[in-house]
A protein has these predicted regions:
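Extracytoplasmic
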Residues: 1-136
Length: 136
């Protein structure tokens, strides 16, 4: 499988189109990559969606860089091409300026794929900096 080309890791910043953040794009907490991050505004239903490309179908490794400055976990559904494939819980990172990475496998189709991070509780998503897709 070769997502994005060359067998390398491809980064998709949350603040760059075609990514969609239904919260706000913010830059008030240091340590993020790029020009900002997706803040789900602590709301259920405020998701982050990424469009990623894969040259062949198969399993890819998804890395989600996040910050959760609360002491409450942020459970999330990872929806790939309309189907829930993972249900990670993003733990507290100690502050909104402390970023961590959660890693898990996701199935991708050949061509364009949508990956949506959808909160499952009223607390919403953690702040999402980017996702990276790597070959398996």
């Amino acid at each position: 499988m070769d997502p994005g080309g060359g067998g390398s890791v491809t980064r998709y910043e949350a603040e760059n189109s075609p990514a969609v953040c239904t919260g706000t794009i913010d830059s008030d907490h240091t340590g993020y990559s790029g020009a900002g991050f997706c803040n789900g505004d602590n709301a259920a239903g405020a998701y982050a969606k990424f469009t990623v490309n894969a040259s062949t179908a198969g399993t890819a490794t998804l890395r989600v860089r996040f910050a959760n400055g609360t002491t409450t976990t942020r459970p999330t559904s990872v929806i790939v091409n309309g189907a829930t494939v993972q249900s990670p819980t993003f733990e507290g990172t100690g502050s909104w300026t402390t970023w961590a990475t959660s890693t898990f496998d996701v199935p991708l189709n050949t061509g364009g794929n949508t990956i949506q991070l959808d909160p499952t509780t009223a607390g919403g998503l953690p702040n999402i900096d980017y996702v990276e897709v790597a070959t398996s």
